């Protein structure tokens, strides 16, 4: 029956599965089912032939195309159309290549589907086919746009009439509506619209969707398809299509709708006149009877979408003279149900016998209009005609529940595909894969609704309901087996056959490509609802059917809805069944598909403003279009999920949905496959059942947008756990050492030097971060132990120190001192290893480089300023301005820090005056503010050192220039004031108004906090006293008269804060009284305070009540205490109360730890003892106060206030001891007044004594204090505490403690038994202590060795006793080895070996049994203990005096250097040869021999030159050179410091390279107390030498 292509014809309804381009009017568009080209939306039409060749069966596999998972729906039977109308039939099924051409699909993916309609000749002069409109103008209403397949575009006067199916809501902005009227040609054109429409809405149609421009897919996204015959005379007529409320879809003009595959029709169908009665063709299905349905479509003017009134198919013409579209539906012989269930597609019957005539200007006929006839009963009894007054609204955007509301449904004619058996629908859909339609369009609005209202409703509905339509479509597609709601009405067998044939021949083929085109359209035009669907992925509201409006008559669908599903449906998933139930419910004509809340807009309220809540709109979240990525959008990874297109069949990983508000998962347990159950939160997502939307072919939940989020998140593609995820790997990833491979370790070895360097820098950085005045000495020791042995490391260390110094100017003094200590550091250069570079040179170069950096900074600032001026926007300009200001601020801070650091280096004599003058001149020349600020900082730092007598003229010039700058007032006031401050500073002889604000020690901080707290306490007490007076009121008078509690029983008013509790600077007290007039025991401050001179600032704060009682019991006539009368008047309670305050305040003042509390108590007890003896007869003249001495020491040690107080306490104890001696002389010995001290008390006293001794190193005082403890049986506590407290202190502290114990042993105050007992308690724990103190054995040896050195205890006895607790532990040898090592350093190994042998010691006593003694001795190098090495006859340890005499004799005799060498080797032991004694004796002898004893004394340089070799041999290192200089200093002192003598020696020694400059600098800065005699004069005499030395070094550095 294929007809030749016609020259004219209406645009055919686009087949959903076929890409079809739009063609210009008048061009034919033969359909070629081949792989379409991906073209643009507005691709120009391509002339194609209207001939439909035989099409192959559509592939059932879903792999090559996106197809609905719903079963196939039978297509409508072909209809008989009038003779003369050309019909293009599709005799065979069409093959579906898996093409991915460009698609134009409604925006929400619910594109309209139109069966390949038969084309009819176009009458010339017919009305235009929506000129100017194009598919791209309308996003959702128009049918799918398939540019890859040619479609004929007819002249503007012809309107195509594709069948309208339930179309998903779209987002295109424009649309025109047309009223479709269906007439039965067999009944004389009777209007059977209402009959058909009322009977066709029971459920989604199983016919394959036919999407034309105006086809409406049903709510599940699919549109039933029927063969359509477009009559030429109806092309000018439009169809007004109503939107379903709640499913927003954009308006579309008919031009939007994509023509289906064109089928030229032989003759035009008769056009119904506006006033004519509708002509409905009764469906006669027996045999091949053909029924023609003429659909009269009334076209209304474009109306705003605000009205959602359904369009009615009124028999009378609308005022707009809408064209009537006739649809002829011809059904051939029915197809048995078995065919639907048995085979996906039966062989199509000739299309000639299965045609539907739809008269619609845009070539689209709503599917709802066709469904009734398609599903008519087998008898094909003509349905009762609906009253012409009740128009049947048709929703082009798949809003069926509103279309037929109120339209009576003919029970006899149930043309809805839902009535078909679901088996058939399943199988047909399996082959055709059309999207199932959740519901047909029930009538929703009364006939009185106007088109304008309808369009108003549509515009809002389509934007929101489009999502719901898509959700329904997606649901139907996802459910692999879901096809029809269980309540669908079964189709008679004969009708089923016809439906299947028609579907197979005409529409089934279009489904797959329709899916792809929906995706394409979503890619291109999804801007409104589509993007909303991607942006907000919320669970869809379950689409629950609404009760029909009052005026609606439920059609036969209600009957069909009650039909249970067939038994075969037991295999379907719950998801599919839920969708079917949902679809069937929503298709009922008298019901609304969506449930509208009471306060929500309803389709019936046409004039009301449309409002939809969030849940309602979220119901459209999972529609098909929402699951596709629109084409043409920018790549926005945060918004668009790319993989939704590429892998639509991938099952959703439920673990990705844990955070989604999703409903309960109703998937049966056997289908979960071990997946985690989703949490039951939020509204259900998929449908009424709340199950997850199913993916195509039922492969599990479709991956969709996630639930509502409080904050936007990235949409991350679901990744299966089985996928191999490639992680980004860094090329040089860090690995812990334990994880590194051999290759990594090899590379690490290659870079070992670099890693060591970096480790060095890290350690230096750590030390610098901890550098404080208090920690300086400890940290400097760590620095000197670092391996700074290359130029690179030295430069790196210098850079670290320098950067730290200039960034922290307040600590520049500490950093400068560190540099001073490192000044002598030398390392070989990288280029010339033989040439060395020293620390000082590199540091000065670094300072100079930073000082001269101003020019570079200026260039950078100019560049930034230029960039800022050229900035285009104000924002960019502001940003650049901030950067410029920040850069200038940083440069300024660096300059100031550098200047301060340079000044501190100069003060330490590391820079010469010449350099500093150069800096001052350079800064003074530049009158910019930065330079002047640096100048002020520099002069403030070093002005006092530069402003000496010789340099005053130069300094005057500087300050005159500064005064000029101030007077000119060309600089800012800030700089002028800074300059003025420097002038004032010089005027005040460089004495600043405020002290140095540098860093403070912890003790200073504690003391300041203590003073502040004390002041606050005073204020509080004063306020309390005032407040109590005010509260009591009454006349002013004595406090006792007002009952003030601060008055004691004796009538004395106790001051709230006694003076005794205030911190007192005892150093100021000597200014008040003469040193000799103060009795250190009698001066008491405040009753009970008992602050004495001897007690320091802590004075007796810890006195006990018993002490106070004893004081109160003293006779008032005591002349030794001028305050004794006052003392007696104070009751014990008052003193006790005040004493508490005093104790707390004093403890804060002293800054001691909690452990020192006992120290205070112990001192107070001593104070009590003293108080007890105050009343005894003593002669003040015989007593001498030690306070003056203590104060002098305090001046020498300002940083040791604690030591000062302890020294004062020791002094008082010593005075007490003297008193006791005198008493013993006059009286017989008396036992102490109080009982012996307890262990706890003794420990507290011992702690105080030891602390005081270690601070002052006053041996006599300490011995006397221990003697006064009068507890010889408990002195082991003193020993134990002494060893324990010094174990982790410095070596000097341990040495001093050992000497104190030795002295106590020698004096008899400490027995050896007590000494050993005290040591045992420590030695027993030594092995455990070794974990925390690795060098514990060395430290113990340092404490024990002094006893042996002085001969206090024999070596044998001592070694055997102290090793008793260590032998079981096997540690005895460890301690002895350390002791022997220290003894060898002091007396030589031979003397130590002699002592060892004399004591009869053997290593066998101290080593574990079985250990090889010989191997041990050899390993530890203690062979001298075995006596194997005999001392040479001539070698002996000469005393220093004898050595000096012998060397002087040799040199006086003029002995050669070699002879002196020989004598030394022959007569001195090896130990003495390398000792400092030989160096000092040799230096003294050589220098003395070089002096020319004339007036004035001079140096014979020739002698020194001759003896240079002799000195150089033994002055082998810097330490020996320093000892030589000490010897020279002592020699000059003995000669009474002859002028210039030392300078001449220094010059000669330096010139002969006997003493190197580093040793000179070390001597200059040495603070060794043993070498201070005459040091000041000597240093002054060689000032010129050191000045010259530094200048010469500077010159060499510059050269």
Curated annotation (Swiss-Prot):
The modification Phosphothreonine is found at residues 207, 223, 647, 1211. Residues 53-72, 249-260, 429-452, 548-563, 674-683, 693-703 have a biased composition (Low complexity). The modification Omega-N-methylarginine is found at residues 73, 110, 685, 694, 1032, 1042. Residues 34-48, 289-304, 1116-1134 have a biased composition (Polar residues). Residues 172-200 are annotated as: PABPC1-binding. The lineage of its organism: Eukaryota, Metazoa, Chordata, Craniata, Vertebrata. This is Eukaryotic translation initiation factor 4 gamma 1. The gene is EIF4G1. Belongs to the eukaryotic initiation factor 4G family. It comes from Homo sapiens. Changing residue 182 to A: Loss of PABPC1 binding. Residues 8-24, 261-271 have a biased composition (Pro residues). Residues 565-792 form the MIF4G domain. Residues 519-535, 574-583, 741-757, 1146-1178, 1186-1225 have a biased composition (Basic and acidic residues).
